[in-house]
Every structure is written in C-alpha cells, then in structure tokens.
C-alpha cells in the first residue's frame, strides 16, 4: 500500500493530515530559527560560457511570461524568444515562439536560491545567476579591479574581457558578466555598459 499522507498528532488532540504530494520539505528547529523566505523565480537570470561562446539571459515575470535573450558572441549574432512558463514544484515548463514555431522545454529545478537557479535540461545541467539592479560602467581601454577577494568568473571576451583579475572594456556596447562576491561566497550577474 502506498504511503501518500503525512499525519501530525498535536498535544491538544487535534490531528492534521497532509497529502505528501503537497509537501516539498520538512524542517525541524526552534520557532525563532524557522523564518523561511520563499525564493521567487520572477526576475532575470544569466548563464554564460566563454568556452561555448554564448550567454543566455532569462527574464521571468510574475504574470508567467518570460523572455530569453541568447547572445552567440563567438558567432556574431543574437536571438530573443518569448513565451510563457509554468512551475509545478520542481518542474519548470517553458513555451516559446522558438524562431516562428512552437517549442516546449521541460526543465527540472535542482536548486533555487536568492542568487542561483540550477536546472537539468535535455542538454545537461545549467546554473543561472540572478541579475543585480546595479549597472557597471567602464570606458573602452579602462579596467575595473575587483577588491576584497571578489572576482569576475564570466565575461564574453568581445565587449569586456578578464585579465589579471581585472575587467577590461574592449569595445562600446553592453554585455553581462558573472561576479563572485567573496564576503557572501555567492555569484551574481551584472550588466556592463562600455562607453
């Protein structure tokens, strides 16, 4: 017989029955330490790989629409797709216009935190990092040096590049980077404008 419910017996005699399909996790602790903050998918998330030659910026809205901007910087072109999404527990389904015809992608969310969205797709695992509202500005030929143990972990190498722990502006335009913040041990994404 399948076990499909969780039954909780309270000291006051009340009993609660919760279907296990509604349970995502159970955490034990004292009441003061159990301030759980639900992380939302809404916002923008960046995945990038200099080795693979492109980055993708996913932007999820609270109305369940999304856009995906892919910049294939190695090949010199970019694409934007849009559509809507649904999330049921750890399953994320994206429907898009996909170059003029319908696409549906089923992704399994393996991790969702304040700064990172990790998914398993048909193409393998990917981790996207939350885009911060701060925009970094740099001039062509100038650099930004990371301080306090921070480091740039992704740059496209076309608009900006990483060299000797610094971010250099190569040509005018805008792009995105991923930056490791040593004080938190987390990676975040930032937009960079080069003038």
What does each model-found stretch correspond to?
Residues 31-46, 139, 145-147:
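N-terminal helix-cap/turn-to-beta initiation motif at the start of protein domains
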Residues 32-35, 78-87, 118-134:
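Edge beta-strand at a domain terminus
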Residues 50-102:
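N-terminal glycine/threonine-rich, aromatic-flanked beta-hairpin/loop signature
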